[in-house]
Amino acid sequence: MMAGHDSGNAKRGRSPSFGVFVRKPVERAPAKGASDGAVDSQAIRIDAAQSWPDDAVEVGAVVDAYGLKGWVKLAAHAGAGRGGDALLKARDWWLQKGAERKFARVTQAKLHGDTVVAHPDGSVDRDTALALRGARVFVRRGDFPALAADEFYWVDLIGLDVVNEAGVALGKIADMIDNGVHSIMRVEYPATGKDGRPKTGERLIPFVGVYVKAVEQAAGRVVVDWEADY
């Protein structure tokens, strides 16, 4: 079986998923040495642009405060319980709200219904949490949970070339779609309209083993059993 997992970089209007495997949520213990109610001035700090990680991937957004003790509620772009895994695993978050960027060390994170709730160290009350509302949340790609050999995060698939087994170029993966059963590659390619003008064509290829024969990340391509005239 081959499963595609959303990284959180897919189009935001959809509700994509990390894949078919739901992992058990992990609740982290508070960081050693942290004291309840004490504000760590470095915990939520203004972050210099040069310290933003090169492999940062947007995985969610702060939508509200949760409770009275500084917890925040988040919407995972990929859906909590699956896409929310990156939010649950990563201890270091980078937050962007407008032009301001902040770094947060997360002491606890867990699933709550269809959302993720978390406690950033230094967020001591509801007002502190509300100040983070609307922030986009990024984590390092390197902090994503490890996958099985036949699973792939969407962020690693988007941008790859798609060719068929005869070597015919079919385009590039522009986006991934979740139809509720499996992932679908949205492949774009240069085409010509009826008026003779250039346009962008589109192919929708299911990301399942019957069509996807190889994912060659080192070569930057996906090999499929698919014809150009389908």
UniProtKB/Swiss-Prot annotation:
Domain of life: Bacteria
Residue ranges of coiled coil: none
Compartment(s) of residence: Cytoplasm
GO CC, any one term: ribosome
Cited Pfam families: PRC_RimM (PF24986), RimM (PF01782)
Subunit structure: Binds ribosomal protein uS19.
SUPFAM superfamilies in alphabetical order: PRC-barrel domain, Translation proteins
Family: Belongs to the RimM family.
Name of the protein in its database record: Ribosome maturation factor RimM
Role according to the record: An accessory protein needed during the final step in the assembly of 30S ribosomal subunit, possibly for assembly of the head region. Essential for efficient processing of 16S rRNA. May be needed both before and after RbfA during the maturation of 16S rRNA. It has affinity for free ribosomal 30S subunits but not for 70S ribosomes.
Residues in PRC barrel domain copies: 149-230
InterPro entries (alphabetical): PRC_barrel-like_sf, PRC_RimM, RimM, RimM_N, RimM_N_sf, Transl_B-barrel_sf
Entry domain remark: The PRC barrel domain binds ribosomal protein uS19.
Keyword line: Chaperone, Cytoplasm, Ribosome biogenesis, rRNA processing
Gene Ontology MF terms in the entry: ribosome binding
